[in-house]
């Protein structure tokens, strides 16, 4: 089960109905902080939850699902926003978060092989006219991007931190030949002080998002991008 907070996307019927409300909530945070005219405007309507209500709903969802899945008192899902019984977690998702190579087949499918990320065309008419020789030569791929070392380090951090177990410092050094602290020491120290990360220095040293960090994961993870 995947459980996320609702995002009202532009161009959808839901956005037509709630777009202005979303913008006002983003600006003011909650209905009580809005100007009187906006409070009156939304009074009695089917309103979207404000930020605090949204977080409370999310925490309740996490706790409830964790208890149903494993009988735990605290949420443990393995992956942020994803829940499964032991042994049934999505292997593709875990592979994606940990940088494992994968091959996507079919229109619009993405792959990661040999440090390169590439995507098959989403145009069916174009795809159907390719010859076997053209397909063998990779003509179906529209976007081919070879990841730089910096990009691979960034992905190791911001994708790996989507796992509740976080990222292991030893694995970072094994992959890139440099200590995690040497590359991201300042960022990690700042996020530790802000209460967004926590570190373990036991036998398997690692860092992971705190409960608060999970709430603002978009901000925390973006700190590892240059």
What would you call each of these model-derived segments?
Residues 1-178:
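C-terminal scaffold of the Radical SAM
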Residues 60, 156, 183-186, 219:
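Long, highly charged amphipathic alpha-helices
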Residues 115-117, 194, 219-221:
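A short, polar/proline- and glycine-enriched secondary-structure boundary/capping micro-motif
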Residues 169-170, 182-183, 200:
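Extended hydrophobic-aromatic, low-complexity segments
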Residues 178-193:
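Short amphipathic alpha-helical interaction segments
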Residues 192-203:
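A short, conserved structural fragment
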Residues 204-210:
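Minor-groove-contacting beta-hairpin "wing" of winged helix-turn-helix DNA-binding domains
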Residues 212-226:
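Short, amphipathic alpha-helical interaction segments positioned at domain boundaries
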């Amino acid at each position: 089960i995947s459980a996320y907070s609702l995002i009202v996307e532009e161009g959808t019927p839901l956005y037509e109905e709630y777009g202005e409300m979303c913008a006002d909530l983003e600006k003011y945070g909650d209905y009580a902080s809005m100007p009187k005219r906006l409070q009156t405007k939304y009074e009695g309507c089917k309103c979207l939850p404000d930020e605090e209500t949204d977080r409370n709903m999310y925490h309740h969802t996490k706790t409830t699902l964790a208890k149903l899945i494993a009988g735990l008192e605290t949420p443990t899902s393995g992956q942020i926003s994803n829940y499964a019984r032991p042994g049934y977690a999505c292997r593709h998702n875990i592979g994606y978060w940990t940088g494992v190579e994968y091959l996507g087949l079919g229109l619009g499918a993405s792959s990661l092989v040999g440090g390169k990320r590439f995507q098959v065309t989403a145009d069916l008419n174009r795809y159907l006219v390719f010859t076997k020789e053209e397909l063998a030569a990779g003509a179906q791929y529209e976007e081919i991007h070879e990841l730089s070392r910096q990009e691979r380090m960034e992905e190791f951090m911001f994708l790996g931190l989507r796992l509740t177990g976080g990222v292991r410092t030893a694995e970072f050094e094994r992959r890139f030949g440099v200590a995690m602290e040497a590359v991201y020491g300042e960022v990690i120290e700042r996020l530790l002080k802000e209460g967004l990360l926590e570190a373990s220095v036991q036998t398997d040293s690692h860092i992971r998002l705190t409960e608060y960090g999970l709430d603002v994961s978009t901000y925390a993870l973006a700190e590892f991008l240059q």
